[in-house]
């Protein structure tokens, strides 16, 4: 499957590498051209600008943003202005869930799906996979399932396949409508940080 990745920091770059290893076509862009060049050498297709990235994607397009939360809404709006009905924007950063709800509502009249994905796995995700907490329209999430399945850890040897459990045993879950993915990630982070603080006081 083809996907565009914007933001090639440690997590974004490693997510591209994981997708390339599993046969996906990745079109990549970053303000730092060196980050783009490094992934082109590993098999990705480089883009010189956001517009170039969009031009190199086939409809229906999917653009995944791995950016700091402070700039994500601005960049998402810039992409939405250039995308078409049926395309999707995925926010895999640590954005506030209410912003995801607002952006989804803003883009919906344009026919553009906005999917928020809480992404957990850090720099180890390249080998171990990423736990994904997904919010957004059912049809759009289903269309992107091959991407989510490739990024996720997989069931592992000790978890029996059970269709009734859906994708959860494989490390990714459609949590609900817009905002649900980032809301669940916020809860996840709160628990994680609470445990770390508690252990520090032991």
What are these regions (language model features)?
Residues 1-62, 86, 123-126:
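NAD(P)+-binding Rossmann beta1-loop-alpha1 motif at the extreme N-terminus of oxidoreductases
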Residues 3, 76-77, 96-201:
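Rossmann-fold dinucleotide-binding core
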Residues 7, 28, 64-67, 91-92, ...:
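Small/polar loops that bind or transfer phosphate-bearing groups
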Residues 27, 47, 89-90, 115, ...:
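Structural detector of well-ordered beta-strand residues that form the stable sheet scaffold
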Residues 30, 50-51, 93-94, 118, ...:
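Short loop/turn and capping residues at structural boundaries
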Residues 42-45, 69, 81-82, 150, ...:
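A short linear boundary/processing microfeature
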Residues 50-114:
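Rossmann-fold NAD(P) dinucleotide-binding segment
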């Amino acid at each position: 499957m083809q996907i565009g990745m914007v933001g090639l920091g440690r997590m974004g770059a490693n997510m591209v590498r994981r997708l390339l290893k599993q046969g996906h076509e990745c079109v990549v862009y970053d303000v730092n051209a060196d980050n783009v060049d490094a992934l082109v050498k590993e098999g990705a297709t480089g883009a010189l600008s956001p517009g170039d990235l969009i031009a190199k994607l086939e409809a229906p397009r999917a653009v995944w943003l791995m950016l700091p939360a402070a700039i994500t809404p601005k960049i998402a709006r810039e992409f939405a202005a250039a995308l078409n009905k049926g395309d999707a924007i995925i926010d895999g950063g640590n954005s506030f869930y209410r912003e995801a709800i607002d952006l989804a509502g803003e883009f919906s009249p344009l026919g553009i799906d906005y999917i928020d994905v809480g992404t957990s796995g850090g720099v180890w995700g390249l080998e171990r996979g990423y736990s994904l907490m997904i919010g957004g329209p059912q049809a759009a999430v289903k269309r992107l399932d091959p991407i989510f399945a490739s990024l996720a850890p997989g069931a592992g040897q000790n978890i029996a396949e059970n269709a009734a459990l859906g994708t959860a045993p494989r490390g990714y879950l459609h949590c609900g409508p817009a905002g649900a993915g980032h809301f669940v990630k916020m809860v996840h982070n709160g628990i994680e940080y609470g445990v770390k603080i508690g252990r520090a006081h032991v």
